[in-house]
Design a protein with these regions (language model features):
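N-terminal short leaders/motifs
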Residues: 113-130, 307-325, 472-473, 481, ...
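Short alpha-helical interface patches
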Residues: 49-54, 65-116, 221-231, 279-282, ...
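Basic- and hydrophobic-enriched, low-structure N-terminal and domain-boundary segments
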Residues: 1-150, 154-162, 167-169, 497-498, ...
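Short, charged N-terminal helix-start/capping segments
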Residues: 4, 60-117, 293-318, 338-370, ...
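P-loop NTPase motor domains
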Residues: 24, 127, 132-437, 452, ...
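A residue-identity detector for tryptophan
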Residues: 99, 247, 263, 492, ...
Length: 602
């Protein structure tokens, strides 16, 4: 039976009783003695006794007509009353907002502690993307908002880094930004104990960093374009226009041509930014001599002879359409944009690669991205790395693992506003969930997100099913207060009228009040936070106490002996790498024969 038909029958079944009762009334009227209606009414009692003498329904046409008519009349009355019924929501007249309870969050928590994302002291979110009940499925993207000193690192970043349990059912890699360079010192040893590979990119002190070469991760012409887009997006001057002008588009063509040439034609050891810089330095255009050819022009001319349809050649020919004077200006712009690479340490950092970004989703790894929280000069390197990382992992999930990485990758992006702009991040964050990748975006204010991503900021925040508010005021507090909604409260007023006679009055009424007003949020206790999980009532809870975590004893916070020695780690790593290279080195063996004189001397 169809559900709609079944529902219709169930709703109308009670009316069969009314058909029976009204049919009996019709039978009583028919059996009552009398020639007319008034006479029958006088003897109706006898008719009722006769009608109900047998419990069986009457099948007389008159009785059936009365029964059906009576039931229809009752149905019409019920319909009319329902149509005009007043809608009351007692206790919710002005709003139904309330704080969530343990019962509300229970369906979203994994019974096994290590299988969860830690949000507050009492609220957690399971790492599984496919729970038994599909309606409780939530993405693992978290938006964390908290002003300076609110404990973003202590109450969110560290607790979640401590979830590196070897016994977890959901193995996880971490990519974490480290604005002060302290996280790697405090947690590095813990990760080594848990069997993690440790990777470090340090843009504050390049001598304490592993090497990162973006060219290693270029596998197609699309990757060339992505690298150029990221480079341009994160090396804008303070006053540069948002919309690309002619000069920026021309630079884009030039970079694409050069990087395409390097990727296709250069030997592996020369595939880096140093080669790109040398090619830019060797480029020259003369206004008074249109036939002049620089060494780079000659390189592309030879490449065109070999392959006229070469990707790099096509880009370079478009660049050459501009006049000599224009090209000179473009070359100056390119030199200015890549000025940071004139620093020897930066070039050395990016000449080789030790990151192995494409394997982070294959085995448990922690990658620390150390950046300055006061200077953004080299943050474009971090933006390039993260852009490449996300694209690499998505491609690897699709091409090798059927759409899902074997190791979940969590991007814990502290001071997200200082990282730089990741191209198409609003689109990436909406699609990474299915590849076993999640992002925790940590900000001091949501306005920081809007300043970088403009209209896309709202899309990014909407793709975070969890919002954790640690502290804030002003616009942040107002937005959170509005999102929490209103509750209905009871209020009473007393009045007193004084005159020849004194009278008193008492008036009760319902009012709507914000669950937590803007001023209440501004003065919120420093140990409390607000959690909003999509589809669940908000929670007003204690921030997570890291001293209660089983792995706290492995942090440098608990014991200074646990401090991670970066210099020692890097020197050991490079010594092992040199040994591997030495073992793999090949040598040519020559047999040298002795002359007759030398043989006689022997």
């Amino acid at each position: 039976m169809k559900p709609e038909l079944k529902k219709l029958l169930v709703l109308n079944l009670p009316y069969l009783l009314f058909v029976y009762l009204f049919a009996k009334c019709g039978q009583a009227y028919r059996l009552a003695a009398g020639a007319d209606a008034s006479a029958k009414l006088l003897h109706l009692t006898n008719g009722i006794s006769a009608a109900f003498a047998s419990p069986l329904p009457s099948l007389h046409p008159f009785d059936l007509c009365v029964g059906v008519a009576g039931a229809v009349a009752v149905r019409l009355i019920v319909y009319s009353k329902g149509k005009n019924a007043k809608k009351y929501r007692k206790g919710e007249e002005y709003g139904s907002a309330r704080w969530g309870t343990a019962k509300d969050i229970a369906p979203y928590i994994d019974p096994k502690f290590e299988n969860n994302i830690l949000l507050t002291q009492t609220e957690r979110l399971t790492m599984t993307g496919r729970p038994k009940d599909p309606k409780t499925a939530r993405n693992k993207n978290v938006l964390v908002i908290g002003g300076s000193g609110s404990g973003k690192t202590r109450f969110y970043v560290k607790p979640n880094l401590m979830q590196c349990f070897p016994t977890s059912d959901y193995p996880t890699s971490f990519v974490v930004t480290d604005p002060k360079g302290t996280l790697v010192l405090e947690t590095g040893q813990m990760f080594q104990r848990a069997g993690y590979r440790v990777k470090i990119l340090n843009t504050i002190n390049f001598s304490k960093s592993m090497k990162y070469n973006p060219f290693v991760y270029i596998h197609s012409e699309k990757d060339v374009l992505k690298l150029v887009n990221t480079l341009i997006a994160n090396t804008k001057g303070e006053g540069e226009k948002l919309a690309e002008d002619f000069w920026v588009k021309s630079e884009r063509l030039f970079y694409t041509a050069l990087i395409g040439y390097i990727w296709y034609e250069a030997p592996a050891e020369e595939m880096n930014f140093t080669t790109l810089l040398e090619m830019i330095n060797a480029s020259e255009a003369r206004e008074d001599d249109p036939d002049f050819q620089s060494p780079v022009d000659l390189m592309f001319e030879r490449l065109e002879q070999k392959d006229p349809d070469h990707f790099a050649v096509r880009q370079y020919k478009k660049f050459l359409l501009s006049a000599g004077k224009t090209r000179s200006s473009i070359l100056i712009s390119c030199g200015a944009r890549l000025a940071p690479f004139d620093i020897r340490e930066v070039r050395e950092l990016m000449e080789d690669d030790e990151m192995e970004l494409d394997t982070i989703g294959d085995e448990k790894t922690v990658l620390f991205l150390i950046m300055s929280d006061t200077d953004t000069t080299f943050n474009f390197i971090l933006a390039m790395l993260q852009s490449q990382l996300i694209n690499l992992l998505c491609d690897r999930a699709d091409d090798k693992y059927g759409g899902r990485l074997p190791v979940h990758v969590r991007l814990i992006l502290d001071e997200f506003a200082n990282i730089g702009q990741i191209p198409n991040f609003d689109k990436l964050i909406a699609t990474i969930r299915s590849r076993e990748i999640s992002a925790s975006i940590i900000l001091q204010s949501q306005s920081q997100l809007k300043a970088i991503y403009k209209d896309a900021a709202e899309i990014i925040s909407d793709n975070c099913d969890s919002v954790l508010f640690l502290s804030g005021r002003g616009k942040n507090a107002k937005e959170i207060s509005d999102a929490l909604g209103k509750e209905t409260i009871d209020s009473f007023n007393t009045s007193e009228n004084r005159g020849s006679q004194t009278s008193h009055g008492l008036n009760y009424q319902k009012l709507g009040k914000a669950l937590m007003s803007e001023d209440e949020i501004a003065i919120m206790d420093g140990g409390r936070c607000i959690l909003q999980l999509r589809g669940v009532r908000p929670f007003f809870s204690e921030k997570f106490d890291i001293t209660k975590h089983p792995h706290y004893k492995y942090l440098a916070d608990a014991d200074k002996k646990n401090t991670f020695e970066v210099d020692r780690f890097l020197s050991t790593l490079r010594r092992k790498r040199q040994q591997v290279v030495a073992q793999d080195e090949s040598f040519d063996l020559y047999e040298i024969g002795l002359s007759d004189e030398d043989a006689a001397a022997e």
